[in-house]
Amino acid sequence: MRNADPSLRLDDPARQLTLAQTLRDLRKRGVRCIAAHPHTDKKILSQADFTGDCCIVFGNEGDGISEEVLEACDEAVAIPMPPTVDSLNVGAAAAVFLYEVARQRKKI
């Protein structure tokens, strides 16, 4: 895996067997791992800090994010939605998260 910052390069990408293992490796290197999770009540998107190095994990539209991956993340963050809306599709959720990242980093 290549990254603009060589210190974030994974030792051996072929050795990274699961997403959870990769997330734990990233956390050891100082990258905050954030799960985009529609059913968390701990933190909403505007309360999360995206100003530093971070990795945002999105689940698939059918099963979401596995418990193992959730546990490997630093925190879970939700997009606030009305009670009648269960979740957004992954493309829409990613767009909302990336807008917030850009806003916090003053790119927009």
Named regions from a protein language model:
Residues 1-108:
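Post-transcriptional modification and biogenesis factors for structured RNAs
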